[in-house]
């Protein structure tokens, strides 16, 4: 499960018994700038500090935005002081966040840091099955996807949940538009850019292979 999906799931579960606010860092910045222009920062502060749990997605978006970081830092402290919780996601570990104030990174590192790994095969397979089932219910008798195609997608689209869902949507659209079950060759054409993206991903094994080849060592 990707970080955004996970954050959404956490929010939905906590919302049953708590006041929860879910927002992206980009949206937080938009609201911040809007409040400055309207000369109404009091309302902004009240809005974001009146919650039990604040969830912010893609916190790395704050990189280099000093004024925004300053306000976030004070919001963070205000919430913690009153016993609220804060959960943020980023595309890297706290100590790897560039152009983020050290005091903010220190706050992040002082909490529970969880590394969300890429989905394994079984999870990808379950997501493919579940997503196609949902789309079948939405478009009854319009989708024809073979087990081989499902297995191919589960095996080949490994980078992220977002790419996996995107691949499923493409194949389903192809099946509906052409009213046919796409074979593997057609599936490869439809997903060409995603497959290339995964094939070209630089890995430690690839680096080792290239270095050994360059220096002619084994």
What does each model-identified segment do?
Residues 118-146:
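Conserved small helical "lid"/interfacial subdomain of P-loop NTPases
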Residues 129-133, 148-155, 162-177, 186-189, ...:
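C-terminal helical "lid" of AAA+/P-loop NTPase domains
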Residues 64-92, 102-107:
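Conserved catalytic/switch belt of AAA+ P-loop NTPases
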Residues 17-53, 59, 63-66:
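Short glycine-rich substrate-engagement loop in P-loop NTPases that contacts/grips substrate
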Residues 33-37, 92-110:
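Short regulatory helix/loop adjacent to the ATP-binding pocket of P-loop NTPases
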């Amino acid at each position: 499960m990707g970080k955004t999906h996970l954050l959404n799931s956490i929010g939905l579960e906590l919302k049953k018994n708590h006041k929860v606010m879910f927002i992206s860092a980009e949206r937080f910045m938009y609201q911040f700038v809007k409040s400055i222009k309207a000369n109404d920062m009091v309302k902004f502060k009240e809005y974001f500090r009146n919650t039990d749990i604040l969830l912010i997605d893609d916190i790395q978006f704050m990189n280099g935005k000093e004024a925004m970081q300053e306000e976030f830092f004070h919001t963070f402290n205000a919430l913690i002081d009153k016993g609220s919780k804060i959960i943020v996601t980023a595309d890297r570990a706290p100590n790897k966040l560039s152009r983020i104030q050290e005091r903010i990174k220190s706050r992040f590192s002082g909490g529970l840091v969880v590394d969300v790994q890429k989905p394994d095969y079984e999870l990808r397979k379950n997501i493919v099955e579940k997503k196609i089932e949902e789309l079948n219910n939405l478009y009854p008798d319009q989708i024809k996807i073979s087990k081989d195609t499902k297995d191919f997608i589960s095996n080949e689209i490994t980078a992220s949940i977002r790419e996996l869902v995107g691949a499923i949507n493409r194949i389903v659209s192809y099946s509906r538009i052409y009213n046919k079950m796409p074979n593997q060759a057609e599936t490869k054409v439809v997903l060409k850019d995603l497959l290339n993206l995964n094939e070209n991903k630089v890995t430690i094994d690839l680096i080792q292979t290239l270095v050994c080849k360059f220096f002619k060592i084994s």
